[in-house]
């Protein structure tokens, strides 16, 4: 009785996957600091400033993606946001990724991407597919999977940084974000 339709099932699973990826990747940027400092000469201040821009853009673009979701559907908003997020990670991987470009990629692009992929848009879409009696359970499942991303991503990132280095780890993140972009079509 929990799932009223196949659309609700698909939306719930897709939203869980989107949030797991989005929040998981976002949570591990601090693990890259030493590598960014040594390889790209990024200072503590520059790294902190980029993360500050990222948080600011996340907050500023959330309502924009919310309006986009209301007008065109949640999948359009989340796909659009994943494009920004993926480009930010990909450009960090390929470069140029020093100076102002570090701020643009790590701060601006990823922050814009988080505005539509992090949790608010996927949860609101899931909420529309469930009746009031089961809505909180469905939204709790999405939140729990986001928390699981917080747990899983640092484990993978530590392993990947030690085995393959920061460049290849960012490349893997780009591929993971592309799978999130595909899953967003079903939200």
Q: What label would you give each PLM region?
A:
Residues 10-44, 62-65, 154:
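Extracytoplasmic
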Residues 142-187:
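Helix-loop-helix hairpin linking two adjacent transmembrane segments in secondary transporters
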Residues 27, 55-63, 117, 150-151:
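Residue-level signature of mid-helix packing/kink "hotspots" within the transmembrane helices
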Residues 61-73:
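Helix-to-loop junctions at the C-terminal end of transmembrane segments
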Residues 100-117:
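Hydrophobic core of transmembrane alpha-helices in multi-pass small-molecule transporters
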Residues 36, 116-130:
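Intracellular juxtamembrane helix-capping segments at the cytosolic ends
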Residues 83-97:
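C-terminal ends and interior cores of transmembrane alpha-helices
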């Amino acid at each position: 009785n929990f799932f009223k339709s196949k659309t609700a099932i698909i939306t719930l699973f897709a939203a869980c996957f989107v949030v797991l990826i989005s929040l998981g990747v976002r949570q591990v940027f601090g693990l890259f600091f030493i590598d960014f400092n040594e390889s790209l000469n990024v200072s503590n201040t520059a790294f902190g400033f980029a993360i500050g821009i990222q948080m600011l853009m996340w907050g500023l673009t959330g309502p924009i993606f919310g309006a986009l979701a209301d007008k065109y559907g949640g999948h359009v908003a989340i796909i659009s946001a994943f494009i920004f997020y993926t480009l930010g990670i990909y450009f960090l991987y390929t470069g140029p990724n020093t100076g102002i470009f570090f701020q643009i990629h790590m701060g601006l692009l990823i922050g814009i991407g988080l505005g539509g992929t992090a949790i608010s848009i996927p949860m609101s879409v899931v909420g529309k597919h469930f009746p009031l009696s089961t809505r909180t359970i469905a939204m709790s499942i999405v939140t729990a999977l986001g928390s699981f991303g917080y747990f899983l991503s640092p484990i993978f990132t530590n392993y990947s940084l030690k085995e393959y280095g920061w460049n290849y780890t960012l490349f893997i993140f780009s591929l993971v974000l592309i799978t999130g972009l595909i899953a967003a079509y079903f939200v």
